[in-house]
């Protein structure tokens, strides 16, 4: 019977057992250290891995892996790179593409060779032959590969781990010989004496990509004077005409060329000085009656540097200075002025360039034009040799500069010495300076196919677009590529040299034969077998005339041949590949070496699209280094550090979420504060999924499924929003804009679900009768949301997605989320008119919630259900949406009162008295008042009419009916 609104004793009885409470095994805490490996074991047992993509029936999609170097622990750069690739591959797999991802490793080169040598005792090193070194290097590389592979797997990376490509494999080495051979036969590879970047610390030539340029390099720069010994008659006549008071003989006997250099050790190799024909030069006299030649535009700077008062006697064009002769600074011979190019400027120095053709590229080029000697004064260790005269035995990185400077000072040739800060190339492995040194090397002549390479760059899509300009400018300006190295751990250049003479033996028969041998036996036979066994049978008789070459190929030629050794050879892949994805430094590395070899052999690029990412920095934007103590270790992110409070175990999915959250086109920060924020986002997504799963524990889609038009408006909107979010996330994945995925996911889980739909749904889910339509329709929607949410997040949060899927309480057709395929929805789920109305009503809801929160902050109320809302509209759009809701909405679900989670809502023409708060805003007046009636002890709504419940409790009519029907 109806109760009277009289004060009665409060009951301690709880209706909790009568509510449909959340029930799921999907835990609030991820416990990733345990749960993620369990999920990976589930994948392994059920072949839920890269094979899913391989078995798809769609178009082949090939993301070709740029091989990391097989040395050292994994770092954040690896994480950024590999997770980006995995996100793309998983998305393409879900889209039905045939995806077969083949991870690779770069295995040859100096770092591994040095590691092997460092691990040996000195006597072992002395007795180590090349074959044993190569065996130890192979073993070391395999250990490193296995360590890195286990790390990649723990990150949730899918790939053909049983068949990766390794540059040390026989099949790879054979294919690489094939690339070299075709380039040689096409006329693009030659042997010549040329200055190359040489590392005295590594004792080998280096490619441009093996250099780095530290910011704090200082060179000992010097200005020196060179005594002029012969001047052209034209200049002499001009001088006499303009300087009547100075005798011709005085000008001839007291004139000096001024030059500036940052490499004093190259002075013994001087063969000329070069001028720019377009620059104006002057002869200027000082107070000591010495006449100096230098660029006119540098007059003031030189006068200040030398602390001399210089008076200009004669101005000449650079072109007039050709063939003026001068006394070599350290040798008993005359040299001359030659005409150089635009590399000679007036930005620094004197405008006259010391030219040593054996120790500089520009010097070499001008030397070729004038047939100058290519004098190399340095040996492989950086020691000055016999061609340096009295400086023999000194070292370019140690004492040579000081000895030569002292010599110049003693002979009154040194004008000034100063330290000069500039960019200077260092060996990227030993971190020591390099030099230019002319040696006999093997080169790829880029000039032969430069125009084709530039056209290939135009044909490729570069992301970001700035990458195209960057690699284009590099290829336009690059010289020939030095591909030979003087080391043992690499693929040999398959050439034979005549023992007596300069002839070489290298042709199609040799190349094909070596390629076949390497395919069967591997490259070690180059050092193991004698010449007779390496040569084709027709050359066996003359084998005694030949010796094997000892050079190996540049490791960039190794990795740059991967399109031939992997994409071309494996039927499950395609060439050109759809995508190359690496750090932005690879424009000068792997992107370029792959492009050059592919164009030289097949006249096409090896890729259709190139995507680049930046570098991982600390939270303050600094480069990570052990010395700064700011290195973020991906292993610690996943498993935690020694102190779990300061370094908690976040798991692989938080690492993956970081990758999706950043604008990877630029350098990206990572650190403890960022990880905390990401972990918070991860928890919100996880808790949203848990709420969805927990509230469909008794739902059966085979019984309670509905057409869209059977559902309440709120449910129709939610499904329409799911379609919109799916479209947005699909576009983000398609365009590789993963940070948009991150933003959309956050907004969907927090704003659309937690703060709106699921907040409103609590009453429907908990309080309704189990099988009531208002509850089942909500469960239907939630089942659609949770299933598709799992798929949408699976490329990024792969472990959480699978965990969600395994906790769906009803039977699904697919065993794994990755077998589901990408969501496809009926277009009828989209409803623009409905969206507009609900957007208007959500705006009103936000304003009303602010007013209610104001009451709560004043401690006038606790829950929103303790209030009623009166709304006096001033916004016609919102008013129309309220009328629409009243006309078309479900009385069980779409009452705006229930959307607000208040006990009553009315549109009024006048406000009443006794307000808790009145808020005026653009939408109208919002009045919050105390809820009338009594609180229902089950649903907590306030009703004017209540009924007696169990043990002196009060129930609203709805709850009273449910209790009477289901629990009595």
From Swiss-Prot:
Biological-process GO terms, alphabetical: isoleucyl-tRNA aminoacylation
Positions occupied by motif 'KMSKS' region: 623-627
Binding site for ATP: 626
Residues holding Zn(2+): 936, 939, 956, 959
Cofactor binding mode and count: Binds 1 zinc ion per subunit.
Chief subcellular location: cytoplasm
Protein residues bound to L-isoleucyl-5'-AMP: 582
Subunit structure: Monomer.
EC nos: 6.1.1.5
Protein name: Isoleucine--tRNA ligase
Family of the protein in this entry: Belongs to the class-I aminoacyl-tRNA synthetase family. IleS type 1 subfamily.
Top enzyme class: ligase
Span of the annotated motif 'HIGH' region: 68-78
NCBIfam families attached to this UniProt entry: ileS
UniProt KW keywords: Aminoacyl-tRNA synthetase, ATP-binding, Cytoplasm, Ligase, Metal-binding, Nucleotide-binding, Protein biosynthesis, Zinc
GO CC entries: cytoplasm
Cofactor: Zn(2+)
Gene Ontology terms, MF aspect: aminoacyl-tRNA deacylase activity; ATP binding; isoleucine-tRNA ligase activity; tRNA binding; zinc ion binding
InterPro entries given in the database record: aa-tRNA-synth_I_CS, aa-tRNA-synth_Ia, Anticodon_Ile_BEm, Ile-tRNA-ligase, Ile-tRNA-ligase_type1, Ile-tRNA_ligase, M/V/L/I-tRNA-synth_anticd-bd, Rossmann-like_a/b/a_fold
Domain notes: IleRS has two distinct active sites: one for aminoacylation and one for editing. The misactivated valine is translocated from the active site to the editing site, which sterically excludes the correctly activated isoleucine. The single editing site contains two valyl binding pockets, one specific for each substrate (Val-AMP or Val-tRNA(Ile)).
Localization per Swiss-Prot or TrEMBL: Cytoplasm
Catalytic activity reported: tRNA(Ile) + L-isoleucine + ATP = L-isoleucyl-tRNA(Ile) + AMP + diphosphate
């Amino acid at each position: 019977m109806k109760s009277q609104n009289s004060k009665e004793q409060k009951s301690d009885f709880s209706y909790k057992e009568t509510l449909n409470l959340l029930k799921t095994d999907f835990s609030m805490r991820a416990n990733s250290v345990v749960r993620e490996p369990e999920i990976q074991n589930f994948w392994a047992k059920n072949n839920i891995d890269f094979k899913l993509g391989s078995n798809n029936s769609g178009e082949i999609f090939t993301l070709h892996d740029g091989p990391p170097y097989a040395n050292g622990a994994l770092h954040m750069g690896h994480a950024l790179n590999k997770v980006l690739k995995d996100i793309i591959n998983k998305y393409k797999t879900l889209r039905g593409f045939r995806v077969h991802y083949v991870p690779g490793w770069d295995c040859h080169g100096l770092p591994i060779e040095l590691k092997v040598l460092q691990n040996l005792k000195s006597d072992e090193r002395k007795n180590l032959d090349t074959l044993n070194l190569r065996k130890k290097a192979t073993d070391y590389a395999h250990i490193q590969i296995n360590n890195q592979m286990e790390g990649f797997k723990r990150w949730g990376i899918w790939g053909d781990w049983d068949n990766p490509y390794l540059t040390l494999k026989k099949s790879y080495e054979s294919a690489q010989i094939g690339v070299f051979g075709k380039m040689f036969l096409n006329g693009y590879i030659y042997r010549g004496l040329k200055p190359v970047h040489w590392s005295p610390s590594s004792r080998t030539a280096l490619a441009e990509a093996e250099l780095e340029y530290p910011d704090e390099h200082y060179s000992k720069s010097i200005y020196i004077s060179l005594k002029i010994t012969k001047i052209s008659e034209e200049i002499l006549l001009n001088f006499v005409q303009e300087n009547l008071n100075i005798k011709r003989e005085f000008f001839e006997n007291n004139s000096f060329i001024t030059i500036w250099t940052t490499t004093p050790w190259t002075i013994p190799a001087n063969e000329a000085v070069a001028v720019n024909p377009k620059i104006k030069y002057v002869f200027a006299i000082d107070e000591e009656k010495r006449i100096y030649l230098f660029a006119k535009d540098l007059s003031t700077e030189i006068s200040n540097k030398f602390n001399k008062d210089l008076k200009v006697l004669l101005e000449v064009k650079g072109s007039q200075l050709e063939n003026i002769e001068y006394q070599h600074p350290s040798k008993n011979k005359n040299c001359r002025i030659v005409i150089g190019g635009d590399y000679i400027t007036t930005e620094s120095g004197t405008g006259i360039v010391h030219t040593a053709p054996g120790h500089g590229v520009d010097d070499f080029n001008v030397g070729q034009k004038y047939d100058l000697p290519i004098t190399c004064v340095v040996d492989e260790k950086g020691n000055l040799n016999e061609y340096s005269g009295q400086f023999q035995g000194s070292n370019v990185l140690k004492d040579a500069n000081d000895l030569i400077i002292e010599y110049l000072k003693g002979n009154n040739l040194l004008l000034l010495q100063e330290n000069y800060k500039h960019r200077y190339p260092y060996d990227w492995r030993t971190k020591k300076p390099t030099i230019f040194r002319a040696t006999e090397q093997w080169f790829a002549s880029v000039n032969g196919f430069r125009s084709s390479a530039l056209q290939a760059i135009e044909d490729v899509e570069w992301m970001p677009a700035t990458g195209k300009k960057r690699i284009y400018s590099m290829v336009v300006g690059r010289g020939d590529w030095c591909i030979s190295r003087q080391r043992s751990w690499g693929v040999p250049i398959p050439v034979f040299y005549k023992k007596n003479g300069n002839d070489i033996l290298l042709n199609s028969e040799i190349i094909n034969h070596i390629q076949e041998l390497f395919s069967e036996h591997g490259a070690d036979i180059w050092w193991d077998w004698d010449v007779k066994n390496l040569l084709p049978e027709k050359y066996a008789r003359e084998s005694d005339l030949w010796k094997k070459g000892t050079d190996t190929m540049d490791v960039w030629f190794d990795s740059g041949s991967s399109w031939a050794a992997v994409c071309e050879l494996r039927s499950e892949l395609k060439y050109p590949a759809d995508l190359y994805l690496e750090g932005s430094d690879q424009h000068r590395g792997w992107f370029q070496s792959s492009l050059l070899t592919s164009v030289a052999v097949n006249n096409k690029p090896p890729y259709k699209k190139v995507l680049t990412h930046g570098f991982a920095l600390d939270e303050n934007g600094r480069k990570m280094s052990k010395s700064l103590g700011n290195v973020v270790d991906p292993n610690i992110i996943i498993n935690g550090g020694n102190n779990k409070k300061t370094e908690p175990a976040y798991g692989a999915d938080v690492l993956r979420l970081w990758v999706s959250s950043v604008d990877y086109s630029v350098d990206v920060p990572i650190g403890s504060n960022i990880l905390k924020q990401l972990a918070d986002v991860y928890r919100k997504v996880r808790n949203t999924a848990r709420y969805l799963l927990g509230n469909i524990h008794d739902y059966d889609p085979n019984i309670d499924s509905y057409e869209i038009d059977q559902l309440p408006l709120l449910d129709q909107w939610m499904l329409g929003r799911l379609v919109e979010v799916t479209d947005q996330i699909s576009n983000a994945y398609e365009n590789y804009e993963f940070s948009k995925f991150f933003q959309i996911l956050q907004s969907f889980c927090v704003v659309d679900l937690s703060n709106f739909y699921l907040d409103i749904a609590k009453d429907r889910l908990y309080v309704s009768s189990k099988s009531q339509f208002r509850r089942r329709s909500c469960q239907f929607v939630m089942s659609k949301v949770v299933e598709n949410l799992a798929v949408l997040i699976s490329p990024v949060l792969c472990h959480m997605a699978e965990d969600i899927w395994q906790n769906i309480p009803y039977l699904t057709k697919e065993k794994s989320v990755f077998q589901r395929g990408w969501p496809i929805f009926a277009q009828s789920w989209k409803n623009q008119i409905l969206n507009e109305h609900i957007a208007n009503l959500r705006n009103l809801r936000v304003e009303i919630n602010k007013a209610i929160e104001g009451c709560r902050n004043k401690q006038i109320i606790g829950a929103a259900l303790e209030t009623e809302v009166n709304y006096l509209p001033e916004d016609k759009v919102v008013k129309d949406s309220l009328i629409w809701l009243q006309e078309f909405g479900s009385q069980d679900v779409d009452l705006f009162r229930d959307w607000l989670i208040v006990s009553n809502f009315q549109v009024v023409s006048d406000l009443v008295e006794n307000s808790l708060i009145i808020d005026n805003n653009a939408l109208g007046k919002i009045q919050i008042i105390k809820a009338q009636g009594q609180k229902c002890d089950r649903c907590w709504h306030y009703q004017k009419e209540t009924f007696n419940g169990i043990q002196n409790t009060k129930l609203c009519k709805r709850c009273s009916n449910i209790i009477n029907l289901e629990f009595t």
